[in-house]
Amino acid sequence: MMNENSNFIKTIMKNELENGVVDHILTRFPPEPNAYLHIGHARAIINNFELSEYFGGATNLRLDDTNPSKEGAEYVEAIINDIKWLGYTPKTVNYGSSYFEETYEKAVLLIKKGLAFVCDLTHEEMAAYRGDVVTPGKN
C-alpha cells in the first residue's frame, strides 16, 4: 500500500534497520477509550500498521485507560472492532492501567533522586505557564 518514496519516516526506519540502530520495527496505536474512533484515528492506525508490516514488524494496541471516570468497556470493544474492520490485528493489547504501580514506584524513585518533582501549580497557573495561540508561555 505504501509507495517506496512516500515519507521521511519510512526512510529513517529503513536507515536505522540497515545501520543496526534497531533490529526490528514495533509500532503502537495508543487511543484513550473514552469515545468512538474518528477519521484521524483511522489514519494513525493505517500509518502504524502499514509501516510496521512493510518492515516485517508488528503493531501493539496500548489502550490509555488511565482516566476511569471517562472510559468504558464499550469503547474498548469498539476500538478493537474498528481496527479489525480496517483489516489489522494488533500483536498485543495492553492497558496503561496495568502499569500504575510500576509507574508510581518509578516516579517516587525519580523524586528521591532529585530528577522529578511534584508540581503544586493551580490549573490557572499552569495555563499561564503554557500560554496559548496568542500569548507566549512563561518560564
Where are these regions (language model features)?
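Active-site neighborhoods of enzyme catalytic cores
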Residues: E4-N15, E71-N139
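N-terminal catalytic cores of NTP/NDP-binding nucleotidyl/phosphoryl-transfer enzymes
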Residues: N5-K14, E18-I80
